[in-house]
Amino acid sequence: EVKYLEQQLDNSLMRLGVEQIDLYYVHRRDPFVPVEEVTQTLASFIKSGKIAGFGFSEISPTTLQAAHAVHPVAAVQSEYSLSTRTPELGVIQTCAEQNITFVAFSPVGRSLLTDKPHNREMAVTIPFLENNPRFLEPNLSYNIAFASKFRDLAFDLGLTAAGLAIAWCLAKGDHILPIPGTRNVDHFKAMVAGSKRILTLEELMAVESVLPIGWAAGDRYSESQWKGPERYT
């Protein structure tokens, strides 16, 4: 509802102590409310000066096109990495065509694309991963073993696996902005190093040869985690 959205926005402005939010996301939209109506409401927030732009998270290409037809969308945030390439089925292309920033979260595959992927013992301590299909056995052992060639390739290229994952992500489009998360300074520096590495066509082909589309075993979300994101094929 318009009143609910505006109240949440006003609450955010108050908590942040600012007069305008640069980018306001609808992370999980109500599928029973037409996206055109939601977009009109968000556009009214721009007109009132409360936000500078808005974006959506985990929406389909069709939904994005419908929203953008009402008012320009500033950004789309979706999971995207060498282990999750679904956005290549239209979202990334639509963003490029419409000059929309594509914000890639989990670009290192929730640790699968790092030098030290989470084992099952670690996964059970992380609520989101505890029942995530890719971190359940036998999928997890398969995924860690399969990605070993990627880790070897990263080493040969003078990067960490996470650094190479970031370099690959950036190479997929000038409009793509990966947002990895880490609490470790060394890991952060390694990913920054990856962001500065421009991969050659041969290197890109090598990366996608060792980790082809669809290599990861298990869905990226459990059934309960799928509540909110739009599925599309």
Task: List where the protein language model places each region.
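Conserved, mostly hydrophobic/aromatic
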Residues: 12, 21, 34, 54, ...
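Short, hinge-like loop/turn segments at secondary-structure boundaries
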Residues: 1, 71-74, 92-96, 119-124, ...
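Glycine-rich beta-alpha junction loops
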Residues: 60, 80-84, 106-113, 168, ...
